[in-house]
């Protein structure tokens, strides 16, 4: 019951921010996406830590094909955004189009200099801890901004529309598949790191969305 109330409180917050100043929310979304891009390209990609979502899937595909993660994310997101425009409608797609464009651009941009930051943090535990907190902060701000980064969220919305599976459950299924793919390719240790990051970051998201209490 408590989780049910928290979920609906999150939804009400997201609906509320949709009515607030577009450009202020856009600035916060951009800053949060920039932070996510730095952490993703500096720590997650080099260490092959798959935490789900399109960014996690990109690490898996990179291992299989050798393509850069930024290129994979750009291609997959573009395809999903186009599909969402026709399937989900223009009204639902507009925030996804804007958000996905900024997010993928910043993922590509941060990948150009993130390698120069890798030497500043070499302790494995600190890498996981910093990644957990930073990703939680970034995602929390992204959710509060009312924008959508695209990726697996689009796929979940499409599955929800046609198969009537709750979006949260769709996301769980998709992310579980991606994380298990990472476990198969990179081993159980990397998967434990990913689960730790997801657990801590989800707590950070709750703090940003709902407050300390």
Language-model regions, residue ranges each:
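Core subunits and conserved enzymes of cellular information-processing
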Residues: 2-213
């Amino acid at each position: 019951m408590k989780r049910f109330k928290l979920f609906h409180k999150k939804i009400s917050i997201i609906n509320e921010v949709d009515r607030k100043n577009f450009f202020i929310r856009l600035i916060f979304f951009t800053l949060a996406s920039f932070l996510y891009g730095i952490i993703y390209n500096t720590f997650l990609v080099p260490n092959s830590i798959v935490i789900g979502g399109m960014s996690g899937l990109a690490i898996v595909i990179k291992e299989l094909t050798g393509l850069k993660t930024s290129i994979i994310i750009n291609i997959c997101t573009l395809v999903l955004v186009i599909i969402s425009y026709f399937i989900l409608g223009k009204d639902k797609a507009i925030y996804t189009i804007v958000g996905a464009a900024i997010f993928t651009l910043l993922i590509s941009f941060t990948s150009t200099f993130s390698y120069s930051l890798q030497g500043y943090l070499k302790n494995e535990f600190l890498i996981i801890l910093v990644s957990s907190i930073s990703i939680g902060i970034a995602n929390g701000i992204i959710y509060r901004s009312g924008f959508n980064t695209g990726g697996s969220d689009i796929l979940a919305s499409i599955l929800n529309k046609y198969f009537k599976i709750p979006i949260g459950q769709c996301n769980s299924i998709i992310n579980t598949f991606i994380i298990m793919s990472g476990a198969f390719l990179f081993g159980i240790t990397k998967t434990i790191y990913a689960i730790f990051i997801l657990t801590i970051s989800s707590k950070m998201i709750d703090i940003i969305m709902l407050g300390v209490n």
